[in-house]
């Protein structure tokens, strides 16, 4: 897997699940989940390319000093620390990406995976799991530029 830059312009995005095609990544009450679309800032994500690291960082528009990061248990959460917050979006189709962990690309590729509870991803965690699969719709996200 290459860690070359995927071209994505800096700016605000909504992150939509391809699995449901109608649910968006939402930050609410200290937790991340997927819910129906709204115009609130808690569903808007600022994407910023960090050239010194050749990776991208996501921050929530409602909480601009917090970043999407992963912990040792594989959970993706909003953190006030920039540790473990660099990502490599791999484009697989128009506006469709698998988002991999930048720090461990070329070792075992880890990617965002939406936990699926009987075909219902509402209020389910987002995990950083090994072995991404372009055929796994739980790992494919649409980035909609605002």
From Swiss-Prot:
Keywords of the record: Hemagglutinin, Secreted, Virulence
Listed Pfam families: Botulinum_HA-17
Subcellular location: Secreted
Keyword match Amino-acid biosynthesis: no
Secreted found in the keyword field: yes
Entry-linked SUPFAM superfamilies: Ricin B-like lectins
InterPro entries assigned: HA-17_C_botulinum (IPR008903), Ricin_B-like_lectins (IPR035992)
Top-level taxon of the source organism: Viruses
The protein's assembly and partners: Botulinum toxins are produced as progenitor toxins of large molecular sizes of 12S (M toxin) and 16S (L toxin). M toxin consists of a non-toxic, non-hemagglutinin component (NTNHA) and the neurotoxin. L toxin consists of the M toxin and the 3 subcomponents of hemagglutinin (HA). HA is composed of subcomponents of 70, 33, and 17 kDa. The 70 kDa subcomponent undergoes proteolytic processing and is split into HA-55 (also called HA-53 and HA3b) and HA-22-23 (also called HA3a). Preliminary crystallization studies show a tri-lobed HA-70 where each HA-70 contacts one HA-17 molecule.
Functional note: The hemagglutinin (HA) component of the progenitor toxin protects the structural integrity of botulinum neurotoxin; may increase internalization of the neurotoxin into the bloodstream of the host. The HA component is involved in binding to the upper small intestine through interactions with glycolipids and glycoproteins containing sialic acid moieties.
Note: This protein can also be encoded on a prophage.
UniProt protein name: Hemagglutinin component HA-17 type C
Lineage of the organism: Viruses, Duplodnaviria, Heunggongvirae, Uroviricota, Caudoviricetes
